[in-house]
Amino acid sequence: MLRKWEARVKQIEERASHYERKPLSSVYRPRLAKPEEPSSIWKLFHRQNQAFNFVKSCKESVHVFALECKRGNGQRIYLVTSYAQLWFYYKTRKTLLHCYEVIPENAVCKLYFDLEFNKLANPGADGKMMVALLIQHVCKALEEFYNVQCSAEDVFNLDSSTEEKFSRHLIFQLHNVAFKDNRHAGNFVRKILQPALHLIAEDDEAKVPEAVGQDASGFSVTPLKQEISEAREKVGLPKQCDPDLSFLVVKNHMGEKCLFVDLGVYTKNRNFRLYQSSKIGKCVSLEVAEDNRFIPKQSKDISEENQYFLSSLVSNVRFSDTLRVLTCHPSQTKRKRAECFNSTGTSVESIEGFQGSPYPEVDQFVLSLVNKHDIKGGIRRWNYFFPEELLVYDICKYRWCENIGRAHKSNNIMILVDLKNEVWYQKCHDPVCKAQNFKSTCSPLPTEVSLLFLLKDEDFTSGETDDTSTSLTKDSQTPPSCNLSAGGLSAAAWDDEDDALFLEATEDAEFADAADKSLGSMDDIPDELIIEALQNS
């Protein structure tokens, strides 16, 4: 028995020495080569809301992307990662071939368009000319309604046309201008295309065809002549007749009239195809169009291709003091006088109107900050910047500024709530404070308005291990559990268990060694393997 024990100890020592020379691989924690890049986050989720909840809990700047699966009927899984991390793998073009940006609900975004028509049903249509005329019309409308000047050089024009279908994406790169969210962008698009919608409605007196995408839009098909005239007068432009937008009316494969512009892409958490991605089952990817006139700014640290990629992202909008956020309501001519939201119910007219932000608890906290010193302030409007998880509140009736130690006489202030860093601070619209780039001292947020507290009731934890999510960085070699009886194991059973564990350890070492050799020649992990691992988890 002693001899057998000594032999076993010697065997253990030999194996320990072996593992010291060739240790088992630790859990892979990918990180980009540049030291300044943040730690890698790369997680997959079956459900979109879980992906967004995970993003909100992260201190890092991460985003949600949708990956189209080859299995199932249009099934998608959701990837959470940073722009830099995604581009690192995306640029190889060997994986992640069918990717979509998920445009977050309520988030400030760029103006964008999805254009398409059936070539066989429209043999005389000149797609390039139609795109050029549309850009010209949109630029003119932006100047008329908002006094925003732009041209074709500010429009990223992407093409994924085939022999059967003309298809384009337009993403406007407005200088220091963005829309409050994609719903407001959609309202603006519908408003400026009213003459074209009217032409379609004349062909079908009963209602606008479903292909036009007018369900629940809040717009009548009658052109908004009065509002357009008012907008022109506001910016000092002469009145004019409705523009001829007949070039936007095309026919679908059934021969029915429809709009060249897809009005269905301005919905909640819309999936919008990424630059250089293709639809599943299709071989044509979204590339820079031949007639594209937009050129991104040159940068020493970012390649031109990466710049194009970042420019194509609709929700890639960062907060700045000079950023102007545009709004467009479904029917501003029928808009009621809005109440300035405050705890006392004091009613004042709000130019933009106010509804609660995605975080009503934060709204109430901000109201508590501006209701003091016998002054009853309120929230004039808010804007949500998803990349930074930043809420920017324009305050009304409360003008106290930390920079000057008193209230401004006429200029209003802003309260900014940084949910990722759990702080709030004050800035203001006063020209002198803006010139100084003034920002007040950061103050911590109360626990009850921290993101972790706000998300506590969600079906989510930061370390998910259930069937609804998985991570590419998660260790897949989970050791089996051992069922021990209350009285322990017998000597024979101990020998069997020990041998089994030794065998398992040996197999693990051999597996790790084989994996190193097999993966050494691979540039990346195929899409099929990623999706199969997720579905089998």
From Swiss-Prot:
Enzyme Commission number, as recorded: 2.7.7.102, 2.7.7.7
Assigned GO CC terms: DNA-directed RNA polymerase complex; mitochondrial matrix; nucleus; replication fork
Ligand binding (Mn(2+)): 114, 116
Coiled-coil spans in chain: 1-22
Domain notes: The zinc knuckle motif binds zinc and is required for the DNA primase activity. It facilitates the binding and selection of the 5'-nucleotide of the newly synthesized primer and the recognition of preferred initiation sites.
InterPro entries: DNA_primase_S, PRIMPOL
Comp. bias intervals (Low complexity): 468-478
Organism from which the protein derives: Mus musculus
Motif (Zinc knuckle motif): 401-434
Family according to the record: Belongs to the eukaryotic-type primase small subunit family.
Self-association state and partner proteins as the record states: Interacts with RPA1; leading to recruitment to chromatin and stimulate DNA primase activity. Interacts with SSBP1. Interacts with POLDIP2; leading to enhance DNA polymerase activity.
Catalytic activity: ssDNA + n NTP = ssDNA/pppN(pN)n-1 hybrid + (n-1) diphosphate; DNA(n) + a 2'-deoxyribonucleoside 5'-triphosphate = DNA(n+1) + diphosphate
Protein name: DNA-directed primase/polymerase protein
Gene it is expressed from: Primpol
Superkingdom assignment: Eukaryota
